[in-house]
Amino acid sequence: MKFLHLADLHLGKKLLEVDLIEDQKYVLQQAIEIMKDQDCLVISGDVYDKPVASVEAMNLFQWFISELVKLNKKIFIVSGNHDSNKRLAYFSSLLRSSNIFISDEINGKLQSYSLDDEYGKIFIHLLPFIKPADIKNFYPDIEINTYQKAIETVISNSNIDRKERNIILAHQFITGASRSDSEEYFVGGLDNVDASCFDGFDYVALGHLHNCQSVSKDTIMYAGSLLKYSFAESSQKKNFVVVDMKEKGNIEIKRIPVKFLRDVREIEGYFNDLINQKPTNDYLKVILHDETVSADYRNRLYMIYPNMLSFGVENSQTKYERSVLLDEVYQNKRIDELFVDFYKLQNNGNQPTKKQMDLLLEVIEEIKGEQQ
């Protein structure tokens, strides 16, 4: 069975208040072309950017799905943290007759479907974005206080035939994956889930993180977003993830680069250099290094870069001012506060745990005692 793995479409999202519907349709048209050679599509959450999606976003998704139905393709979808599970699953029972399978309201177990191909059965399991509170009510005798425990509980209480090939769609953060500032996450890594939760699945189709990447092993895959949804993602390579699942244990995964209507880029340099570049419609963050910046520089750059969304200056003066400011900030911080800043810098913005902080304070007190 061949399938296309997508996630984090975020239909209706804006980039610094700029509407991206046209850009989103451009990449979805490419997905439709790819789907002509696939058996089914899986979408691992965050179809929309907001729980109450705009009319434009819903119309775009309806067009996309309708085009795939014309191709007689099966479609499997789970909701993400940006979606409203109830809204996304509205009319889901009717849509199944059109081979569209959307995760229903959470009931404490995986929602599973079986398909057949030349190698036998394939089971596709749907796991929408869940939080511990979503699962507690279904298992009152089990202590479920972490995302890890919530997912382990759902999977262990679901009927899974490990002898067959199993695909799971999920929308969670797997420990060790790289984040960007476009994604929501919890301080201290409270939403972390270990990859071992998904042991036994032949392919784990993940959503939630925008960078296309595998975690722990090749078959635990984040498809990533098709577009760059912040300038922090400007260096990311966006891909369509195409999977060819043959007999159990034999999987080929291919990444097809996405073509953008307008790229999201950061450019920097001196005004005289940037003003003489070839005009572009890309979405740009422009940083000037000139020591003196004329009041008309921004407007003149707009003539070359009509989609310049961010404009800034970095020169010897601004760097000096920034370094002085940082020095003043750090001089007024306690050791434990400095440790938290350093830890967050090294761990994708995650906070140290209470146990780690207690250990640090213990060491600080020991050092103070030795110095007295």
List PLM regions with ranges.
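A conserved active-site cap/scaffold subdomain adjacent to cofactor or substrate pockets
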Residues: 195, 202-258
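Accessory, non-catalytic peripheral segments of nucleic-acid enzymes
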Residues: 40, 245-372
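Short, conserved loop/helix-junction motifs that constitute active-site signature segments
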Residues: 69-71, 160-162, 196-200, 277-279, ...
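Short coil/turn segments at beta-strand junctions that form active-site/ligand-binding loops
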Residues: 1, 39, 73-74, 120, ...
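N-terminal active-site segment of His-dependent metallophosphoesterases
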Residues: 1-65, 355, 359-366, 370-371
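His/Asp/Glu-rich metal-coordinating catalytic cores
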Residues: 53-54, 60, 76-216
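Divalent metal-coordination and catalytic microenvironments
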Residues: 8, 28, 46, 61, ...
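Conserved beta-strand segments of alpha/beta enzyme cores
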Residues: 2, 74, 101, 123, ...
